[in-house]
Amino acid sequence: MSSAVLVTLLPDPSSSFREDAPRPPVPGEEGETPPCQPSVGKVQSTKPMPVSSNARRNEDGLGEPEGRASPDSPLTRWTKSLHSLLGDQDGAYLFRTFLEREKCVDTLDFWFACNGFRQMNLKDTKTLRVAKAIYKRYIENNSVVSKQLKPATKTYIRDGIKKQQIGSVMFDQAQTEIQAVMEENAYQVFLTSDIYLEYVRSGGENTAYMSNGGLGSLKVLCGYLPTLNEEEEWTCADLKCKLSPTVVGLSSKTLRATASVRSTETAENGFRSFKRSEPVNPYHVGSGYVFAPATSANDSELSSDALTDDSMSMTDSSVDGIPPYRMGSKKQLQREMHRSVKANGQVSLPHFPRTHRLPKEMTPVEPAAFAAELISRLEKLKLELESRHSLEERLQQIREDEEKEGSEQALSSRDGAPVQHPLALLPSGSYEEDPQTILDDHLSRVLKTPGCQSPGVGRYSPRSRSPDHHHHHHQQCHALLPTGGKLPPEAACPLLGGKSFLTKQTTKHVHHHYIHHHAVPKTKEEIEAEATQRVRCLCPGGTDYYCYSKCKSHSKPPEPLPGEQFCGSRGGTLPKRNTKGTEPGLALPAREGGMSSAAGAPQLPGEEGDRSQDVWQWMLESERQSKSKPHSTQSIRKSYPLESARAPPGERVSRHHLLGASGHPRSAARAHPFTQDPAMPPLTPPNTLAQLEEACRRLAEVSKPQKQRCCVASQQRDRNHPATGQAGPTSFSNPSLASEDHKEPKRLASVHALQASELIVTYFFCGEEIPYRRMLKAQSLTLGHFKEQLSKKGNYRYYFKKASDEFACGAVFEEIWDDETVLPMYEGRILGKVERID
């Protein structure tokens, strides 16, 4: 159906009256406009002739009242209702022009088509065809009218057409819905549109706007000036039409109503294209179209037109002509403001050209220069990536080599094969320990054997490795030595034989062992001598290096040669004891790695196997004797360590080497064949679980009363008597225990000496097998102070051991619950148990 449906004549006055029907024509002028002649499939209406001004003035039926220059003008009636607008010929044409610009003219055409269909004769055969045409044109497809109609209304019309039940009111519901939509949206926008404002400003009397397309030729000329190029001169040709008195004024309502049109026309006339798909002029880059936030634009309008106490005059009871009962509250005003903000939405602002220059990065350059710069940057990036990749590959290769060497060292040490690399004595990460770890190992060793003295070989460093490690360590020492049992002069510093063999781990351990285990005040001369010796070790004169590790000895040869001095200790350190140990004329046994008087060269430690047998025999004897005499060793051996502590270093070393490791004289060095043979398999490592059980058993026996005491000589002779008949690959304990026999009495003596000022507190916590031990500077301790020492807070029961004759064991555990009670002491210390309350 054609969209050229225009205003039709109103129904005959004799027809049924409808509230939404337009006003009847002026009496006497009914015949000036011919009636509508609908055609088949098309609702046509002849365009009415212009009504004269006299008829327009008298169309209210009352004539011109006396005393008035003119009645209400059509422009005033257009603002009253949509019917008044559509009832006027010029108003309907102007409204249609507005809807065409908004691309929703189908709503107006559908409204006029419904009016024309209502006037048709139902008996005419054309009526059914017109109804079908209206349904197909506006309702069946997905048009603007179809989107605004309710589904029930569309269903009702479709059913009526299918059943051919045609009625004059079948489109009334659809017309009412479309009319409501136009009244709420299009009609309100039309009253503030530029077309309507232009027509109002001209007074509706200028007929130039009706020629050559009528009102559609109106054009809004307000806005920014077009962009002017630097080499051009601006002329006023573009503003000729703006000089006419018909230009819309720059009022707030006018600007707000014409904002969208002005922005569109400015974009079309400017250099920048309105469509994003088209290229952008460089002059306007970065100055795209912006939309002012709805809140800022509307708040600005609201604040400028706000009816506040400052902006309203208070001359009489009415405020600016507004009755006080219609003012409303602040909440109502705010509600209206927010409703206006939601209705208006975003206000599009016109394009504002900027004259700033483009940034340097966006300045167009020559393709060749751009390509050269891009290539240089890409090559630089490629070099960086390649260098980083190669560095990562090298690091990965180093890690793989280290892992491979570590696995080879572990396999070679397990199979007993000789290791050619000098650093085989120092596996990766073997000595990287912090002081806290060494201190923890020291305390755990003290707690494991509090009542047993270990067979010692003199001064030693605290144990920090497992037994199997020390065993393999000794085996490697034997395997790396020459067959003749002699060392070249270059072996004076075994672990620092070459500068290339000085690793970070070795240096770290040397520093740690030297500081923490030999921290005795030294003179300036001793420090210089040690530095000179260290330089000689780092710069050897020969090319063949042999590794030799004296794991327990700190003595020096009687006549050292220049640059020929042993670097003792487990980790290859330079102990201070070497500088002031024994006297030059003192001869050391072969077991201690001393110098032979006849050969004048360092000898092999030939009694490593004998030492292992001593350790194994000591474990068997101590296990057998601890059942009956667990405390005899602890209380009897006090004189020897005190005496040895007061003796000068030379006498201490002499006594130790003359008596041997077990405390009695040694006549000859006993050698075992498997010790000297590097092809023999290593001994089986001890069971860790068995060692822990043995330590727990000894700790449990500490609390038993002392029953028997004997002399030092007989006790040591019973425990340390060697079993020479046993020779074979048997399991033995950690070799570091062999040196505890010499140091345990010394430690116990110092503990008893400090009891006058310090208090030893030992307790078992919640059934744990290993107890906790603390030293407190106090003469006595209460339960409250004891609770403060616990790191874990909670509800516990506290039991403390005290001497008692009630039982045969001679002691009981007494429960104490009062915080002010002084805790009992047992054998000079506090021994308690903390149990959790279930």
Curated annotation (Swiss-Prot):
Bias kind Basic and acidic residues: ranges: 56-69
Residue span of region Interaction with beta-catenin: 413-476
Key words of the record: ADP-ribosylation, Cytoplasm, Developmental protein, Phosphoprotein, Ubl conjugation, Wnt signaling pathway
Low complexity bias: start-end ranges: 303-318
GO annotations of cellular component type: beta-catenin destruction complex; centrosome; cytoplasm; nucleus; plasma membrane; protein-containing complex
Motif Tankyrase-binding motif location, chain numbering: 21-30
Ranges for domain RGS: 81-200
Protein name: Axin-2
Organism for this UniProt entry: Rattus norvegicus (Rat)
